Amino acid sequence: MQPTVLLILMTSCLTYQVIADKPKGNHLHSRPERSPIVLFSDAPHAAASPADENDNFPVLKTANQYEDNNSATFSHLEEKHDFAEKQSTGDDEESVILNRVTGEVLSDTVDGSQGHLEPKRFNEFVGKRNTLPEEAGSFDADSQPGSLDTVRILAGLSNFGQPQIIDQGNMKNHRTLKNMIHNLYNTMNEDEASKRQYEFVGKRSYDFVGKRTYDFLGKRSPYYFLGKRYDFIGKRSPYDFIGKKNYDFVGKRSPYDFVGKRNQGVFTVSPSSTKISFDDNYLPYLSSVDAGDLSDVNKRYAEFLGKRKRTAEQDETSQRSNERLVALLQNTGFRKRLSRMLQNQRLVEHYPEFIGK
């Protein structure tokens, strides 16, 4: 039991000694105060003002702020800049943006770099309309601030003079060069006089903004007139007239010679010569032909549509023709040919565009 008691006493003594060495106060919520980092920004719009007694930053006094910025002395600024670098002790410290001339606070506390102070440059082109020549204003160098710098920049566009001639005080050459550059500048519109000239501005300019039909439609050759019927329909040869009912070429077979002509269904029957003997001048439903009626012999039976009064001779002739028809119908091949011809004739009457095999 004695070693255990000694171990407990030694542990308690060490604990009290550690607590006594710690500083008093709430050490969990206390944080050492850090001095802010002082940054300076170039603000061209800031004007110089007299320094106050409590101001820790000196005021820069320049003779002409817009013409010569190099005349100011920044030796005391470098000392303050070194002092500000010594105050920075980490990455998460707060920084205050002050004006380099007046020492005024320009913005709230920022973390990190001062990259947001630089003006943002839009690399992507946002479309604008083309300015007309009469809308573009004239340029006058005497009324513009920094006209001498403009002349120096534009002097490189011509070979009439050099910037050194202007700096030497030769006002005659200076005025001649400036007039030439101004005449060139006034002839250009706003887009041509800008730093960047874009070939593609906004949407494509049409020849006539109000026209509804464009020159090219789709991926194939353009149509000449959208209102008219198309010249080519489908994959086959085009039709001459869209409105006509009967086409010259229908289907895959040969076309009709005359679309309006209908087949009259005149068929020649060739009966067997063994049963019936033919007469050269035989015409059914007609009497014997006289010598004066030779013109009627060559007349086709299909063209005769009238009816005549029958006589006894015609009745005998009709009976003989009926006997001959009965004899023909006994032939199987003739019946097949006759049925095929009758079917084709019926189709031609009901469907004029049908072509039989």
Curated annotation (Swiss-Prot):
The chain residues annotated with the modification Isoleucine amide are 233, 242
Q: Print the keywords alphabetically.
A: Amidation, Cleavage on pair of basic residues, D-amino acid, Hormone, Signal
Instruction: List Leucine amide occurrences by residue.
Output: 217, 226, 305
| The keyword Zinc-finger appears for this protein | no
Q: Which residues form the propeptide?
A: 18-119, 130-194, 263-298, 311-357
Residue list for modification Valine amide: 126, 201, 209, 250, 259
Protein name (Swiss-Prot/TrEMBL): Fulicin peptides
